[in-house]
Amino acid sequence: MPNPDIRWSVPSDGHTFPIYAGLPSDMDRVGEYSVERDVATIRFGGDTWALQADKGPVMKATTGEATGSQVFTAVGDGKTFGASKNVSCTADRHRVLIHAESRKDFVLFRAPSDPDAPLDLENAEKIGQFTSENGGLKNVHVSFEGAGEKLPLDVQVFLSWVARHAMETRVLSSTWRLSLFLLVLIPFLVLYFLGYI
């Protein structure tokens, strides 16, 4: 059955994000994301995925032994994940490209099965989108359309985790830049108000 939406809700216990799927009017809880003692996991379909993501451009999710210990990957085209304009995701036999249209708006495209084949964004098939506007980081919402609705649920859940990480790394990098700017600006403001400048 096609699934048009994956949503993450605000955690009730402070560290476990419930993950929902389905029509916005009738969503079912399908999994949960948590970070405990610096170990990130997604519990989905009775399985626990081990998640690996840092500042680098590579993310990995390894499913449990019950599902064959599959490795889903997302690789950005920048030095860091937050600086990547395009992220190539491979989950099972499905390939998806996440393209950052702006700092806050992202589009999912169906990628060619050959990883070396170039993707023409003008003619590529759009299969979904997400944004960090209106609390999008806290309440992740990935909307699928067309072929994206027919992706397996585990692939959609993986893409929602990649979406959350893409938004989170951009927020952290912009916060870091703003903090550095303010640290440099403060001495000049103090000197200005004291009349030395």
Over which residues does each language-model region extend?
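C-terminal single-pass membrane-anchor helix
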Residues: 160-197
